[in-house]
Amino acid sequence: MTLWLLPRLKLLFGIAAVMVVLQLINSLEGYSLNRFGLIPRELQALPGVLLAPWLHGSWLHLFGNLSGFMVLGALALLESRGEFIRASLFIIVASGVLVWLFGRPGIHVGSSGWLFGLWGLLLGRAWFRRSFADLLLAALALLLYGGFFYGLLPQQGVSFEYHLAGALCGGLYASWQRGGQKRRSRKRTRQG
């Protein structure tokens, strides 16, 4: 296996392992950990901005998110581990804040906002950078997960707010990433 790939896969499988262990504990505790999920406009629920993506309502919920997360996470990790971590932190925090501000009442849990954020990141990179590699990855993301567009629409029992906020934040991060690359490129040109 290529040396650069192994640490990236370890990161991805490590994240998945944490989610599975938390789900095991949560299911054994009657899903009592979900009280730490995100509850819109409740000050005491602000920690849910960071905790909600790690908690799930059922094993089916977890594995539904985890399968897509592993694929889209692997595609996003092709850029770099550091960029994946920065993008993930931005997506988790920014989408969580948006859901806290604008979400419907109730407890929001699950990694789908993060998942949609990675999807938005891949599509955004293709839109803003237009490199062959980014276009190829976005085409693959659309081919595999084109149905995500339906997840952006309101549905009963589904936090479409997290889906929408995640996708928007992933695209926004991609636009900032592009802007940073342009600034670095201009700086190198001036110093040349």
Residues covered by each model-derived region:
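A detector for small-residue-rich transmembrane helices and their helix-helix packing motifs
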Residues: 1-192
